[in-house]
Design a protein with these regions (language model features):
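Short glycine-enriched loops at secondary-structure junctions
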Residues: 12, 83-84
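Short, small-residue-biased leader/transition segments that mark boundaries at the very start
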Residues: 2-9
Length: 200
C-alpha cells in the first residue's frame, strides 16, 4: 500500500470546520477551534527552514500559521490568501508574493487563474495546504473549483507537500482534486484516525 509520513498530536481536531454548510464566512471559520488549529500550525512550523520559499493556501489555518513565520529572518511566502498576505506585509524579513485574481468576498481568497503566469517562475520548497477531503484514490480534494485551480498550480511547483488534515477529512472526498496522494510528502493529523493502516 501507499506509505508516507504522518504526524499526529493528541487533541487536534478541525483546522477548518465546514460540516453541512460549505459557505460559512471566513470570520466564523477563523473563530472556531483556535486551540486545535494552533496545535496543527505549531507542528507544521517544524518543517520550516531559513531561506525557504513556501506556499500557503487561503485557509483560516494558513492565517494562524502566519504568526509562526515572523520569527524567521528570511522566508518567501507565496499565497492566494489576502488576509494572510496582509498579516505578513509589515515584516521586512519576509517576502510576500500575493497571487492575483478575483477576490472572494466570503473567504478573502484569490480565485481563478488570472495570476497563473507568475507561479511557474517560482521555485517553491514546501506547500502547506488544507483540504475538505483526502482519499488514496483522489488525493486532496476541495469544493471550491476556482481556488483549487490555484492550489493545483502551487503544489505542482513545490518540492514538498504538507497536508493539514484532521481525522474527519480522511477517507472523504469533495468536488475537485488538486494533489494526488503519491505526491504528498507529509500529512499532519491527529490521533483520532479511525483506521490508521488505511492512511499510513
Amino acid at each position: 500500500g501507499h506509505s508516507f509520513p504522518t504526524r499526529r498530536s493528541s487533541d487536534l481536531v478541525l483546522y477548518e470546520e465546514i460540516d453541512s454548510n460549505l459557505n460559512l464566512s471566513f470570520k466564523y471559520r477563523k473563530s472556531k477551534n483556535q486551540v486545535e488549529k494552533n496545535k496543527i500550525c505549531k507542528q507544521a512550523a517544524e518543517y520550516l527552514e531559513e531561506g525557504q520559499c513556501i506556499a500557503l493556501d487561503a485557509s483560516s489555518t494558513a492565517l494562524l500559521f502566519a504568526k509562526y513565520l515572523i520569527k524567521f529572518n528570511r522566508l518567501t511566502i507565496v499565497t492566494n490568501g489576502l488576509y494572510t498576505a496582509m498579516a505578513l506585509k509589515d515584516h521586512p524579513n519576509l517576502k510576500v508574493i500575493l497571487i492575483g485574481g478575483l477576490v472572494s468576498c466570503k473567504s478573502g481568497s484569490i480565485e481563478g487563474i488570472l495570476g497563473k503566469e507568475i507561479i511557474p517562475k517560482i521555485n517553491i520548497d514546501t506547500a502547506f495546504v488544507s483540504a475538505h477531503g483526502f482519499t488514496l484514490e483522489e488525493g486532496l480534494t476541495d469544493f471550491n473549483i476556482y481556488e483549487c485551480e490555484i492550489k493545483k498550480l502551487l503544489v505542482e511547483r513545490a518540492s514538498s507537500i504538507v497536508g493539514l488534515l484532521d481525522y474527519s477529512k480522511l477517507e472523504k472526498h469533495s468536488t475537485t482534486s488538486f494533489a494526488d496522494a503519491n505526491k504528498i510528502n507529509t500529512i499532519i493529523t491527529d490521533d483520532k484516525t479511525p483506521d490508521r493502516k488505511s492512511v499510513v
